[in-house]
Each structure stands twice: as structure tokens, then as C-alpha cells.
């Protein structure tokens, strides 16, 4: 089984049917995007926009969002936004029941026969790789060791693919001048909102407490990703203990795993994270194309489950 996920071979659609009215508190829109990240979308719509979930960049996706504001519809090649109505209820993460997926795959004749036998199998409900920023692993390692100075420095200076030219300059300055807090805070390229952190460090070099002065949204996203990693690690240990092969799960697993936030995470508003340990695909079917050994596979997964994990399970099970 072979596949290459991109906007022409990977399609995702939220299965969500909100009850809409003519006049309500929130405006509801359908967003269709191709090859665009969630961060790219956020630059085009109001900041108060709410989603059921974040959709993959390497796909063509259809999803709902709501906002209190009126916005113009968009009809571009890789982005469409269409007004659908209003509601007094807002959208939240996980409000929809399922996501449907269509993926272009290649199968040989023996794999084709085996594939349908797998559709009823239970699959380990891991978070997919796209859930994790490349910096998560290192930051988690430093935090676990209690190396808060190194963790703070890494958080403030580690490069990201989303960095602007100005962000790159700021990170470079902080890295080069680390410890010279007064000099950093006086730099013209440091935004006023960031200077509070360096004023604090100038008076009190408590690196753990200093995290209270970093950009909260970015830190919270990082800590949530760390919680997801802890879930994956816990699930992997349970799967090994139950002699699960690869991603194939068993009902012998506890139905859910609860990840309790650390005292550090609680300071930034993180709560307990509860997630099911396995899932089963629904509505599985194959459709032939006009090319030999090429098929469209269609399936639906519960909210929060990753198609990339399911595809990986199918591929490894066919080996």
C-alpha cells in the first residue's frame, strides 16, 4: 500500500450539521482550503473565529467556523469561505461528531483482498506527528530535567518555520545577548510586550517564574502538545504491556487515559486531558479509478482521531 498525502490526494470533511437560524449571536461559515495551514487561515479571518478542530495543511479540507463579526465571502483557487447562517450557540473544539476522509492509494491485488478484513480492527488512538511542533521534544526534555533556564532560552530562541524576518532578528539578539537583560530590554527591535520579561530577569533571575512573562498563547500551545506527547508515551507503554502488535489495539486496554497537568502546567490554565485509547473506522469503502492498482479509500473517524495514524495502521498491517 502506497500513498502520498497532498491537496490532490487527501480530502477531509467535517460531519457537522448545526441548526441555523436567520438571526443569532454568531455568524456561521463553511471554509474550504487546499494546501493551507491553520495559521495561514487565521491571518485572513477575525481573531474571535471558533473552530471544531484544526485541519491538516497537506490536504483539501472542508470545515465550519463561527465569528461574531460579518465577513466577506472569499472565492479563491485554494480558499473559499461561504456564509451559511447564524446561531446563538458557538462552535468549540470537538463539537462535530466525525470527520470523513478520502485518500488516493495504490494497492496490489493481494493487498486489496486483505484490506477489507482490517476495517473492523481497533487502532491505537495516538496523536499524529502533525500535532507536534518540531520544538516540543527538546522543550519537554529540558522541562522534565528541571533545567528552566535552558528551557526558557530554547522557548525564546528556537527557530520555527513560521518566523517572520523580525522574529528571526529578535530570537538571534536574545540568543547572542543571553544574560545581558538590560541590553536586551533596551533594544529597539524588542516589542514593549516582551520587555517585561527581561525587566523581571534583571531584578530576579528565577527562570521558572520568568515563564509567567512570556507570550501565553504560544506557551500554552507548547504545553498542550507536551500533554499529547505524554498521552502517546503512556498509550505506547500500555500497548506493549498488552502485547499489541504495532498500532493494532485490543479491548483489554483501559478505555481512556487521563493525563493530569503538572503544577507548572496548571499555572497556565491547563486541565486534565482525557482521551480514548483506541478507535474503529466507520463507512469504509474502496472506489476504483481509471488507473490500475489505484483506488480512492473512503472512511470516517471519530472527532480527534488522526487519519495519518489509521493509514499507517493499514499500511503496516498489509506488510
Q: Can you describe what each PLM-predicted range is?
A:
Residues 1-302, 308-319:
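Extended, charged/glycine-rich binding lobes that contact polyanionic ligands
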Amino acid at each position: 500500500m502506497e500513498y502520498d498525502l497532498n491537496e490532490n490526494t487527501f480530502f477531509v470533511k467535517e460531519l457537522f450539521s448545526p441548526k441555523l437560524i436567520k438571526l443569532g449571536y454568531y455568524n456561521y461559515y463553511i471554509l474550504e482550503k487546499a494546501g493551507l495551514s491553520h495559521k495561514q487561515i487565521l491571518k485572513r479571518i477575525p481573531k474571535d473565529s471558533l473552530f471544531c478542530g484544526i485541519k491538516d495543511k497537506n490536504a483539501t479540507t472542508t470545515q465550519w467556523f463561527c465569528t461574531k463579526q460579518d465577513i466577506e465571502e472569499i472565492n479563491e483557487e485554494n480558499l473559499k469561505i461561504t456564509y451559511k447562517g447564524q446561531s446563538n450557540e458557538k462552535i468549540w473544539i470537538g463539537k462535530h461528531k466525525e470527520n470523513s476522509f478520502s485518500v488516493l492509494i495504490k494497492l496490489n491485488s493481494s493487498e486489496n483482498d486483505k484490506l477489507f478484513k482490517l476495517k473492523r480492527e481497533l487502532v491505537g488512538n495516538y496523536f499524529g506527528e502533525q500535532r507536534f511542533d518540531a520544538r516540543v521534544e527538546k522543550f519537554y526534555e529540558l522541562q522534565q530535567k528541571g533545567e528552566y533556564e535552558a528551557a526558557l532560552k530554547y522557548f525564546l530562541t528556537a527557530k520555527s518555520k513560521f518566523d517572520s524576518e523580525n522574529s528571526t532578528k529578535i530570537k538571534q539578539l536574545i540568543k547572542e545577548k543571553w544574560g545581558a537583560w538590560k541590553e536586551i530590554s533596551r533594544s529597539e527591535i524588542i516589542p514593549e510586550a516582551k520587555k517585561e520579561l527581561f525587566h523581571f530577569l534583571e531584578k530576579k533571575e528565577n527562570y521558572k517564574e520568568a515563564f509567567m512573562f512570556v507570550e501565553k498563547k504560544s506557551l500554552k500551545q507548547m504545553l498542550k502538545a507536551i500533554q499529547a506527547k505524554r498521552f502517546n508515551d503512556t498509550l505506547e507503554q500500555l500497548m506493549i504491556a498488552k502485547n499489541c502488535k504495532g498500532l493494532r489495539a485490543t479491548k483489554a486496554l483501559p478505555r481512556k487515559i487521563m493525563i493530569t497537568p503538572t503544577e507548572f502546567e496548571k499555572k497556565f490554565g491547563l486541565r486534565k486531558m482525557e482521551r480514548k485509547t483506541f478507535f474503529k473506522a466507520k463507512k469504509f469503502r474502496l472506489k476504483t479509478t481509471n488507473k490500475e492498482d489505484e483506488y480512492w479509500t473512503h472512511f470516517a473517524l471519530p472527532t480527534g482521531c488522526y487519519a495519518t495514524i489509521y493509514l499507517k495502521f493499514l499500511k503496516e498491517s498489509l506488510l
